[in-house]
């Protein structure tokens, strides 16, 4: 009920958009959730190229025919705009299928996975957003660490842990030194994390206003009166109704309301990880851990942003934010997750098929020319 009350009313553009999300995209997302629930999740392991190629085609179409907005290309399909920020949520699952198929290559497959993860990060940084990069790094990093500990690629676990840590260090260094130069206000945003009041009318403006609004919030109920600037941020036309939904709930209904939302999400993640780690199949564990890590990264990015730590823009609060693309994708991921929990107990891993075969199409040996069509 609290969340339904945050739906804007009126005839403005935000109210119209929110009505579309509630009455059009929400039923469509629920239908997608049901469809993904009954889909055999092994599809992503048997056909690991489908999702990455699909994302590549969408990005190509957005680059050629999309509308430039907010520094990125948006693909417009009628009244539906594909958000590049939300589309980045699918990249961890796309990597998961390829990572599973690379098991057949042993140590070489693990190294190739690290290179592939770096390529994904660079692609996300150019075609999507820095939030998507961090979400992917977290999800892929956890997946590679679990694979190393459980010896899914090779029996020499310590070697893979060392390679994993080295890859993480390289990615962190890359992101730290690359991002501020890649984005115009990178250094200013980094500065506002520590001293948001240093530039209250510039890059630290939103952070300062959010902290002021939260300082007027109470334990339960409506917050104390704020100035005209903060009051404007809390109107129906404000982004506090979408990207900063927790801050909105905290001010209007108290810290208890936002605490309940965070607690429910924490319980969902806790039960999900507990179920995921009990999966008997390797691919079932991979898919479930990847999706749960994606949800976790979304929440970990969303909460600090709502507390006024404005380093990067949040992607979405899973299942609750108004964004049509984010809602659609999160519901689809939840459907795949429950599909794993539904059939994961009976699913058995098949022998991995190598992506890179050692056999040659044409061979010359002992004066004989052999052509293999296998």
Question: Which residues make up each language-model segment?
Answer:
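A structural signal for hydrophobic alpha-helical transmembrane segments in multi-pass membrane proteins
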Residues: 1-69, 325-342, 346-355
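Transmembrane alpha-helical segments and their membrane-water interfaces
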Residues: 15-48, 89-104, 142-151, 270
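Membrane-interfacial helix-loop-helix modules of multi-pass inner-membrane proteins that assemble, modify
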Residues: 43, 57-82, 181-192, 228-230
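Hydrophobic alpha-helical transmembrane segments
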Residues: 48-69, 121-125, 167-176, 294
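Hydrophobic alpha-helical segments of polytopic membrane proteins
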Residues: 109-124, 130-179
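A juxtamembrane structural motif centered on a specific transmembrane helix
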Residues: 111, 301-374
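Hydrophobic, glycine- and aromatic-enriched re-entrant/interface helices and adjoining loop segments
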Residues: 156-259, 283
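Loop-to-helix entry and N-terminal half of a specific, functionally important transmembrane alpha helix
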Residues: 273-314, 320
């Amino acid at each position: 009920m609290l969340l339904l009350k945050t739906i804007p009313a009126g005839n403005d553009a935000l109210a119209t958009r929110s009505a579309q999300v509630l009455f059009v995209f929400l039923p469509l997302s629920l239908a997608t959730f049901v469809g993904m629930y009954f889909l055999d999740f092994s599809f992503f392991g048997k056909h690991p190229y489908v999702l990455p190629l699909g994302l590549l085609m969408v990005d190509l179409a957005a680059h050629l025919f999309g509308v430039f907005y907010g520094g990125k290309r948006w693909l417009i399909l009628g009244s539906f705009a594909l958000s590049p920020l939300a589309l980045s949520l699918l990249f961890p699952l796309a990597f998961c299928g390829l990572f599973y198929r690379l098991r057949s290559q042993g140590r070489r497959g693990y190294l190739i996975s690290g290179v592939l993860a770096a390529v994904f990060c660079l692609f996300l940084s150019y075609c999507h957003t820095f939030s998507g990069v961090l979400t992917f790094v977290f999800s892929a990093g956890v997946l590679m660490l679990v694979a190393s500990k459980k010896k899914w690629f090779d029996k020499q676990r310590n070697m893979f842990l060392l390679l994993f840590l080295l890859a993480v260090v390289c990615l962190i260094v890359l992101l730290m030194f690359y991002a501020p130069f890649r984005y115009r206000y990178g250094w200013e945003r980094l500065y506002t994390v520590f001293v948001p009041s240093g530039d209250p009318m510039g890059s630290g403006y939103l952070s300062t206003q959010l902290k002021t609004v939260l300082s007027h919030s109470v334990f339960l109920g409506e917050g104390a009166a704020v100035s005209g600037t903060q009051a404007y941020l809390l109107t129906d036309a404000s982004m506090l109704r979408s990207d900063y939904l927790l801050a909105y709930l905290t001010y209007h209904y108290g810290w208890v309301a936002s605490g309940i939302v965070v607690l429910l999400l924490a319980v969902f993640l806790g039960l999900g990880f507990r179920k995921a780690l009990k999966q008997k199949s390797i691919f079932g564990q991979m898919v479930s851990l990847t999706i749960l890590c994606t949800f976790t990264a979304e929440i970990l990015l969303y909460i600090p942003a709502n507390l006024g730590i404005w380093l990067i823009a949040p992607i979405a609060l899973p299942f609750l934010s108004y964004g049509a693309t984010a809602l659609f994708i999160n519901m689809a991921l939840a459907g795949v997750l429950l599909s794993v929990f539904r059939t994961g107990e009976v699913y058995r891993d098949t022998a991995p098929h190598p992506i890179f075969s050692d056999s040659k199409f044409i061979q010359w040996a002992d004066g004989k020319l052999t052509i293999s069509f296998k």
